[in-house]
Every structure is written in structure tokens, then in C-alpha cells.
Amino acid sequence: MNTSVPPAVSPNITVLAPGKGPWQVAFIGITTGLLSLATVTGNLLVLISFKVNTELKTVNNYFLLSLACADLIIGTFSMNLYTTYLLMGHWALGTLACDLWLALDYVASNASVMNLLLISFDRYFSVTRPLSYRAKRTPRRAALMIGLAWLVSFVLWAPAILFWQYLVGERTVLAGQCYIQFLSQPIITFGTAMAAFYLPVTVMCTLYWRIYRETENRARELAALQGSETPGKGGGSSSSSERSQPGAEGSPESPPGRCCRCCRAPRLLQAYSWKEEEEEDEGSMESLTSSEGEEPGSEVVIKMPMVDSEAQAPTKQPPKSSPNTVKRPTKKGRDRGGKGQKPRGKEQLAKRKTFSLVKEKKAARTLSAILLAFILTWTPYNIMVLVSTFCKDCVPETLWELGYWLCYVNSTVNPMCYALCNKAFRDTFRLLLLCRWDKRRWRKIPKRPGSVHRTPSRQC
């Protein structure tokens, strides 16, 4: 991801001197070719995964999709054209191709850094202003922000690169070389690097620190909430009052075995429900908001067959309850007329907070991986920019070339960061690479009334 002044077009960079040995040329060509292939393949996997797996179509992943588009441009055009430039020792494709390459490279680079800023601000506001911000956080709004980022990048760089020679009345770029004409002075290159790299990195690191602090505060609050529940967990007073079931109320003759099985079932169902929600949101970087809007007083009725028992005594059925019905309250609702609901409400609140905290930590982990890769790959070049401002000839040509390619390697690393930190991306990549992806193998499983969750069938 080329996010500041590319070393390839800096006046401090010279092309490979003629006379390089054939083995050196072969090594450079093979290495850069493999890097380009890996970059294109990885980012194409991101785009295809987003298309075929609906679980990945979340608001925050739209920003990753835009980032992958910029990286794909870098891997397809920038890497290969610069490799040609290095191996030939001069620019042989003409001035128009040079300006178009530079414009495309800079627009994609600036769009990349702006997408990183969007991701950082999105995570920051999601954590610090969960109610007000998430109400406005829609795919349409995310697409608008991404489009604006690309438009601003285009307006900032493309006209200046393409038309500067006409504004000043002449083209001063030396024959056989390719660089931006108005960046011919080191001090201008330095100012551009400060605005395009150091300032955004400072903002992103500050936002990440705030996100980390807020997440830690939530973890402490959750620990305190769970600690306050501990004394009430031994009584089990809510097990009979929260559910209406056969033999659960006022029937001392109920067989213990049957009652025990019935009482265990809702807990198993509830645990499955939470596990299923967590699996669904494994690939999502959004925070839990839907459960906040559930209407109090509502209940979920789960139909399940009763377990037959051989030594079963006749029991008295409670009024208005079918033998195979188990009722449990929704996350914020309570079973009408039930007793002991306060501990149950606290338990659900703790689970909801735990689930939200886990998702926030996953999102922060992905952001930290992308940000770390960006800093590690772009810092060496930008340090050289600072040095060259005060000492023009202090940076060897080889270091400029390595610093440049290290910048491009960031576009190769980004898809690996998505797969490393996001299980949904990782599983989808694996199925695509093994040619085992088949939409017909995906089945719909109801997660809660009115919602659908897609999970791969066992055949996958």
C-alpha cells in the first residue's frame, strides 16, 4: 500500500545502473514477480470472499474491501511498472505512461491511508459512542465515506501530476526518468511525507490507544459485574420460575429424572444460542446493537419433544401449558409473573457485555495488525526522506530501492492480516484456495425469530 511519496519517483532515487549481472536481474525479476503475484492473489481473495460470503458483508468490512482495491491496484500496476523501470535502467514507455502510472499510484496510495483513517475513526466512535454512532452506521453511509476518500485522493493528486507541466509551461523531468515534476525539491518531498505519513500515523496511533483504554475499562466493568453475580449463582432459584414446563410448579409427584432433563434443556438451548451468535459474528467487526432494542416482556417459546421415562408417575399439567413447550425470556424480557428474574437479568446482561467485549477485542486486533504492518513497512522509507532533506547524498541507492519495495510489501501483507485476525476471512480463503466453495452447500439456520444465519454444511 503506497501511502506517501513513493521512492520510485523521488529525485533522490536513481534506477539500477547498467551492467547489472544476469543473475542479479533474474533474482530481482523473480522476486518482484512473486511479490506482485502474491499481492494480486491475496487481494483478489478478499474481493471474492466479500462477494460469496454474506457473513463478511458488514459495515467495517466495506473499509477493508476498499483497502483491498487500492492494494490490488498497487500489485497489478505499480509493482510491475517499477520493476520494468529498474530492470531496464530507464523509463522507456513515454511521458504519458509515466504520468498516468504516477497518478494511479498516488491516488491509490492516498486512498489507502484515508481508508486506514476511516477504519480507525469507525472503531473509535463505535467504542466511545456506541448508541449515537451506531444508529448512523449503515452500509450506505460507509459507501459514501469510501467514495469521498477516493474522490479527495483523486482531486489532490491526479490533476497536479498530469497537468503541472502545462501550468508552469514546460516539462522539467529528465529524459528516460519518471518522477513527479513538482516534487523535484527535497523540502517539498519532506513536507509531503509529513502530511501523508507522519500526521496520519500519529492520529491512528492516538485513536488506537484510546480504543485500547476504553476496551480495558469495559473489561474491568464486566469483571465487576460478574463478581457481583457470584453470590447468587448457587441457589438456582430462577430455574423453575423462569420456565413453564410439566411438573415444574406445585407437583411434588413429578419424576426427578424427567424434571431434571427438562430443566437442563433451556440452558443447553441458551448456551447454543450464544455460541451460534458468536460464530456468526466471528467475521464481523461490528458491535452488538440489535439486542439492545428488544422489547421487554416478550418471550421466546421453544418447542421440543419430551423425553419418555419408563417409571413415570402421572403428573398434573399446569394450566395453559402444553407438554412439549419450554418458555424462556428474551435477553431483556422477563416471563410474566415469574420470580427470581433479577439474577437472570444480570446474567443475560453480563453475557451480552461479554459478547460485545469479545467482538470489540477482535476488531481492535485486526486494526492493530493492519496498523502495525503499515508502520513497519513505511517507516524506513520515510526516515530516509527525513535524512535526505538535510543530507542529499547520505542515503545509498540500494537502501532507497529496498525501502521502496518494503512499502509495496505492505500491500502483500494486508490480506494476511485479515486472515490472521478474522476467522471468517480465514475459512473463506481456505475454501476458495481448495476449490471447495459451493453456495449450494450453505444452509440457512435460524438464529432468532426474524433473522437468518448462514453456516457451511458439514460437507465443507
From Swiss-Prot:
Residues 328-343 have a biased composition (Basic residues). One of its GO terms (cellular component) is plasma membrane. Glycans are attached at N2, N12. It is found in: Cell membrane; Postsynaptic cell membrane. Disulfide bonds join C98-C178. Residues 1-22, 85-95, 165-185, 391-397 are extracellular. The modification Phosphoserine is found at S254, S451, S457. One of its GO terms (molecular function) is G protein-coupled acetylcholine receptor activity. PROSITE patterns: G_PROTEIN_RECEP_F1_1 (PS00237), G_PROTEIN_RECEP_F1_2 (PS50262). SUPFAM superfamilies: Family A G protein-coupled receptor-like. Residues 225-257, 274-297, 310-351 are annotated as: Disordered. Keywords: Cell membrane, Disulfide bond, G-protein coupled receptor, Glycoprotein, Membrane, Phosphoprotein, Postsynaptic cell membrane, Receptor, Synapse, Transducer, Transmembrane, Transmembrane helix. The chain crosses the membrane at residues 23-48, 63-84, 96-121, 143-164, 186-209, 367-390, 398-420. Residues 238-257 have a biased composition (Low complexity). The keyword Phosphoprotein applies. Pfam families: 7tm_1 (PF00001). InterPro entries: GPCR_Rhodpsn, GPCR_Rhodpsn_7TM, Musac_Ach_M1_rcpt, Musac_Ach_rcpt. GO terms for biological process: adenylate cyclase-inhibiting G protein-coupled acetylcholine receptor signaling pathway; chemical synaptic transmission; cognition; entrainment of circadian clock; G protein-coupled acetylcholine receptor signaling pathway; G protein-coupled receptor signaling pathway, coupled to cyclic nucleotide second messenger; neuromuscular synaptic transmission; phototransduction, visible light. It comes from the Eukaryota. It is a multi-pass membrane protein. The muscarinic acetylcholine receptor mediates various cellular responses, including inhibition of adenylate cyclase, breakdown of phosphoinositides and modulation of potassium channels through the action of G proteins. Primary transducing effect is Pi turnover. Belongs to the G-protein coupled receptor 1 family. Muscarinic acetylcholine receptor subfamily. CHRM1 sub-subfamily. Interacts with GPRASP2. Interacts with TMEM147. This is Muscarinic acetylcholine receptor M1. It comes from Rattus norvegicus.
